[in-house]
Amino acid sequence: MLANNFLPPSTLGLSDVEFESLVKVLGMLERGEIGDDQFTMRRVQHPCRTPACLCGWANHVSTGRAFQLEEKPGLTIFSKSTYGPRWRAMPRRVLELFGYGGRPTDPVYLATPSQAATALRSFLTHGEARWAEALAD
């Protein structure tokens, strides 16, 4: 396990609870507690409302206090609602960590838990996810 020389939450644009939840998720990823079948950067939650991506897991481990999710109505009256954070309220660097706003074919959406751990550690340490480096592993 690497020593933690993380930037302060305020430097990262995070609240204390958001920071603490991301540190907890990092530990879970590095210990292999979040498996491939439980992780995808393509969505915040799986259709069954279990956590999926870094943002979803941070929300989950903080019992909903970090990156609070709000209901997003379905596209039609027959569509189910989805849940997501207030993306517009997040700093750019946090959006980049979560892979928000990318093209559906961006490699970040295929990241493994190990690659996500590398990007998350980079974000907490340097203030940038550095996905290209993480995905090269």
Language-model-derived ranges and their functions:
Residues 3-135:
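Catalytic phosphate/metal-binding cores of nucleic-acid and nucleotide-processing enzymes, i.e., regions
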